[in-house]
Each structure stands twice: as C-alpha cells, then as structure tokens.
Design a protein with these regions (language model features):
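An extracytoplasmic/periplasmic, membrane-proximal ligand-sensing/linker region
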Residues: 25-31, 36-47, 218, 227-288
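Short helices/loops that flank or line small-molecule/ion binding pockets
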Residues: 69-83, 96, 129, 173-193
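A structural signal for short loop-to-beta-strand junctions that line the ligand-binding cleft
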Residues: 99-109
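Pocket-lining segment of extracytoplasmic ligand-binding domains
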Residues: 135-234
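Flexible hinge/capping segments at coil-to-helix
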Residues: 119-139
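Extracytoplasmic small-molecule ligand-binding "clamshell" domains
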Residues: 23-89
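Bacterial N-terminal signal peptides that target proteins for export
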Residues: 1-8
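N-terminal signal peptide c-region/cleavage motif recognized by signal peptidases
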Residues: 15-17
Length: 288
C-alpha cells in the first residue's frame, strides 16, 4: 500500500473515532412563561434543567418562551429540543411538526386541570350571559385555558366574542387576573393553577376574583420532544425515566418543581385527544 494511502486511512479512522467519542451537544429545554416575569420563570425552572442535565449526562440549556404559541413554534423549528408546554401548544407542535409527548405533569397528584372564566365579585356578573356588552380578555392564541377551550365553549353556546363583548383583548394570564381584581377588566379566561398560585403568592386576593365558569377536566401540561429526537429511543427512554423519578427526588430537592407539582406520569398522544378535538371543532386546527 502506498505510504500516502496508508496515512490517509489512519487519518480517516482517527477522525471517525473522534466523532464517535464526541460529547453530544446541549439539549435546549423550552418552558412557557408560567411565572409573572422571565427572571422568576428562569429561576423556577432552572433546578429542573439542572436535574435533567445530571440524569442525562449532558448539558441542558433553559429557554423561557414568552408565549404558548411561540413555545409550540420553537419545538417545531428546532429552537428547542424538549419542552414543558401547555396542552394546546403541544397539540399544535404535534400536528404541525410531529413533536411527541413523553410525560404529563401532576398537579396535586392529578394529570388534569381546569380552564376558568373569572370576574370581580363587585361586578354583578354571575354567568357568561351576564358578560354581554362587557370587556373580556383571552390569553395568547397558543393557550389552552386562555383561548382554545373558552373559544370552544363560546362556539357551543352560539356566542361570537367579536360581537358579544364590547371589547376583546389578548394578554398574559397573570395580567388577566390582575386587571380583573382591580376592576380594569370585566372578565377573562384563565386556569385554576394560575389563579391558585397568584393567590398563594399574594399577587391577588381570593375575595377579589370570582369564578363564573369552569371547564371539564383538561389534560395537564405536556413534556414533549421534537420530531428530530423522537427516533432517538435511547434518549427518549432516558428522559422519560428521569421525569418519572422526579416525584421521589422532590423529597430531597423540594424546589425542583413549583408548588403543587408533584412529578410526572407517562402519557402518550391519545391523552390529548380532547384538546385536539376542540381545535378541530373550532377550525383552529386543520384536518389531516
């Protein structure tokens, strides 16, 4: 064998060995804006990112995405690899880009939560029909409880928000609760977990917020992986195992998840069928 060919073969083998032994790049973890601001959100979910990094043996970078719609898009376009996201955001990412859920978060031990409509007790509003001609706020259009589910309920009641309300705005869940309690907004869509958290944190008072409608139980937030990672079964299995172990880990590390979150349970795409059905029924999800 000519000397130059021998040298070339050695070079190729050494490079391929180097690639084989190269450490995997960081995983990008996206989370929605569950807390009032990005800084608090990052501080709340950084322990989860650090825990996953330790369990997976690779760096996990945390990204807070301002909107639920934006979080769904980030998982679809590669800006994030894994995400803790609302049910509607997950369904959007699954429908458009093949993202897959690996686990559902448990809130007070249950994989479910509720969409609600809140008003100020002093408003005199006691039902959805009382909202005619009033101001109303939805969450962003990637929100399950703040947009999809109340929109679906209004549709079933024959209510067109654009004509039924005097004014409709789209804003963050925390802003909806704050403006309702101050009397700056007649009513708005939210979810029970957010209202509970804001009351416990002293951000609003329970006596200033009244629930006038509550949905049927909804599947809780999804921990999902991008379509690119779905085929990496070893990593997906490792990630799922790490999430399943969080419940026990919370005993040693209570700040691993926010208050009331007690771990994860394994779920698949079928668990989110009620959200998908609502998206299809309202025309916000195109049939395949």
């Amino acid at each position: 064998m000519p000397r130059w060919i021998h040298a070339f073969v050695i070079l190729v083998l050494s490079l391929s060995g180097g690639f084989a032994n190269a450490e995997p790049g960081p995983l990008k973890l996206g989370v929605g804006l569950f807390q009032p601001d990005k800084e608090k959100n990052d501080a709340t979910y950084r322990p989860l990112a650090d825990y996953l990094a330790k369990r997976l043996g690779r760096e996990v970078k945390l990204f807070t995405v301002d909107t639920w719609e934006g979080l769904a898009k980030s998982l679809a376009n590669g800006e994030t690899d894994i995400a803790l996201m609302g049910p509607w955001g997950y369904v959007l990412a699954n429908h458009s880009a093949g993202a897959q859920v690996v686990a559902t978060i448990l809130y007070d031990g249950k994989p479910e939560y509720f969409a609600i409509i809140v008003t100020n007790p002093k408003s005199g509003i006691n039902s959805i029909q009382d909202l005619k001609g009033k101001t109303f706020a939805f969450g962003d259009k990637g929100s399950t409880s703040g947009y999809l589910i109340p929109s679906y309920h209004f549709q079933k009641q024959g209510i067109d928000p654009d004509t039924f309300f005097s004014k409709v705005i789209y804003t963050k869940h925390q802003a909806i609760e704050t403006q309702v309690t101050r009397g700056e907004l007649d009513a708005g869509a939210d979810y029970n977990r957010n209202r509970n958290a804001m009351i416990e944190q002293g951000l609003i008072k329970a006596e200033d917020s009244k629930i006038i409608w509550q949905s049927d139980p909804l599947p809780n937030d999804a921990f999902a992986v991008s379509a690119d990672l779905v085929t990496n079964r070893a990593l997906v299995n490792q990630l799922q195992a790490a999430l399943m172990a969080i419940g026990a880990e919370l005993k040693q590390t209570p700040n691993l998840l926010p208050a009331h979150y007690v771990g994860f349970v394994a779920k698949d795409n079928s668990f989110y069928k009620p959200i998908r059905d609502a998206g299809l029924a309202t025309g916000k999800l195109a049939p395949k």
